[in-house]
Amino acid sequence: MVQSLNLGGAQNSQAASGIRRINRLPIVVVIVLAVAFLGIIFYGLASRGLYFGRDKGPESSSGEPASTFADQIKRGVTDGIIGEPQQQTTFQPTPVETKQVDEKASNPFTPTPEQRRGQELEPEAVWRARLEREQQEQYLRERQRQRMARLQANDAAYDAPLAIDRGKLEARTATDDTSAANTSTAISPTAGASDLYAAALRAGLGGQNIDPNGQKSKEDFFNTDLKDLGYLPNRVVPQQSLYELKRGSVIPATLITGINSDLPGRITAQVSQNVYDSATGHRLLIPQGTKLFGRYDSKVSFGQSRVLVVWSDIIFPNGSTLQIVGMAGTDAEGYGGFKDKVNNHYFKTFGSAVMIALIGTGIDMSVPQSSTLATQDTASDAARRNFAETFGRVADRTIQRNMDVQPTLEIRPGYKFNVLVDQDIIFNGIYRN
């Protein structure tokens, strides 16, 4: 029966014997590795559970808070939360405790010793000696300071020149003015010793402390009469006559002749109002219509607008004359000098310059230009160049000469002014024609 089931016969048996069976060794190795891996995982989980299970009791806990684990994880990284500022406690020294001694009860009738004062006064003799020593020390210091100042002043005076020209000293501190050089005078014989000494000091110092604005001379002028402090040297002088015209009074007048500062000259004026005595104001001293005779200054600097006028004589209507020795004239408002018209000669200064420039330009344009090379000098080029140079020099000289022309001040007749009385005038009596 078994043979009948063998349908393929011998050929099928040979074919089956030719097939090779797969090896089972890799499958066994894979299964062993998987079992080992699962065993390791199971062992790890089991051992971890057993380890944590031991610490669940209160007796087995380490006592460390749970926050330490978080700190270990952060490893010192602080929180990103800004808290309130911590108050720093300043160091304060501990006060020394003083033990108070309990006052013992004492008998009020028992005499107690007097308490000593905190600071006893030194004896009067010692105090007076110390005060006298301090005063003597101050006195010696002041004497030494004055002695050193005197020695320095003497050295400066010894180095000063023997001849002192006060005009040069004033010109050094004043502005460059031509009139100052003409009016400079040598030192007056009536000058005081203090003025001479001050001038010698300034000359000895030389140019060390130069005052460009002349402030020192202004202070000297202001304090001329205040050098000697204390009582005034002069006493009150009573009125010498009933017919006096005191200093500070004014004589109103009107100019008759005009003034032109191109040349110096004499002028006349007429008193416009009656002038009475200074004490009562009822005694007529100078009647209306009295003539005044004076002169004016023709030296005018650039920018000046006033004319300096002085009056020398008063001629009364009855023919009598009084010399008033150069009293100054002021305008109606009290300003020094007269001011009316000012001619600065601007047209002459700039007009001549413009005219010469136009003439030079016309001559330069009228000369034909050279057609030759620039390196060659022709007659036309030489003529044009000479004309330009000549007119340039003439223009410079003309402008410079016109710049030196002083302004012309003109005061027209009829100008109202006042004569300022600077000295007391005593008249013979009330004026009678």
Swiss-Prot record:
Q: Does the keyword Transmembrane helix apply?
A: yes
Task: State whether keyword Cytoplasm applies.
Answer: no
Where is the protein situated, by its record's location annotation?
A: Membrane
Tell me, in one coarse class, where this protein mainly resides: membrane
Region described as Disordered: 84-124
**What keywords appear on the UniProt entry?**
Conjugation, Membrane, Plasmid, Transmembrane, Transmembrane helix
Compositional bias (Basic and acidic residues): 114-124
Protein name (Swiss-Prot/TrEMBL):
Conjugal transfer protein TrbI
One Pfam family from the record = TrbI
User: Member of which family?
Assistant: Belongs to the TrbI/VirB10 family.
The membrane-topology field of this record reads: Single-pass membrane protein
Gene Ontology cellular-component terms for this entry are: membrane
Which NCBIfam families does the UniProt entry name for this protein? PRK13831.1 (NF010405)
Provide ranges: composition bias, Low complexity.
Answer: 85-95
Q: Where are the transmembrane segments?
A: 25-45
